[in-house]
Amino acid sequence: MLSGNYNFQYIDWQHAPIGNENFEHVGNLVTNIISPTVTIGLTNYINLSYQQIFGIRSMNWMSDENSNHHRDEHSLQDFLNANGSAIGDAIFNLKYLLTNTGNTNGSRIFLGAGLVIPSNSVLTSNPFSQNDDETYDDHRHFSLSDGCYKSNLELQFYIKNMTKKRYIPTFYGFTLNYKSPLNESKYGYKASKTIVGVSSILFATKLKKSWQPKGLSLGLAFINTSDAFWDGKKAPNSKSEFIMPTIGLIFSQKDKGSFSINLKYVKDNSILPEDAPNANIESFEVSLGYRKTLKYFIPWINP
């Protein structure tokens, strides 16, 4: 199976003066991510997937003042404390299908385990480090990768309901994901442990025309991150916990695959890992997805 996602995230942020910079800090951080995925069925119950992240993050500094913390820049460029690249993490996942009722009513349960392999698009030194006079050298806070290998555990539990009524969901359940760093990056950063729980409901629209959406999805994501560390010291604002609502539409045709669009919004100051006073941060995200099952069998694999 081939699938892919495109994510556009716009973070609008501002915070009060910090250090010796006695002016308001205002800007936005725009992220464009493409994540193609290849999934291979090894048996009728086990599949292996490989996902590769590509993207760019761009900071727009919306002030005429000069700052050591912010400027117009993007993640393709190297900086004093950052390696630039368009290549992000690689993710390998192995999933086991515990239950599957096929085209009838019932449960569908996946158990998964995987490995996240970091890219070289990383920060190369602590952006929170201060000089003896409590000033900051020029630095960057963002990159595509955090430089840490991580384990990835996942549980998916969904119920399929073959209803003909539009107001009763045809698919509902949750996904629980846990990522834990296996090491520090070679530059002294240890990433947060991350728990992501996503509950979702899918309603069939019963619309017949090919251009009309076949499904309406509603979801709620819970994200929890533990403290991260730079050189053994807690990274400011790395510990977080917030809820993010989502809404989306699904379009599908039997021979052409399925296409989805989702909208997400969250207002939480922990979205950006910066030690900023009186911050006001909100995020808007659009996600486009495509999925198609290929009628191809690898000769040496007999699922």
What is the meaning of each model-derived region?
Residues 26-59, 161-198, 207:
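Glycine- and aromatic-enriched membrane insertion/assembly motifs of diderm outer-membrane
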Residues 2-4, 48-50, 107-113, 151, ...:
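Transmembrane beta-strands of outer-membrane beta-barrel proteins
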Residues 14-17, 179, 183-303:
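Outer membrane beta-barrel transmembrane domains
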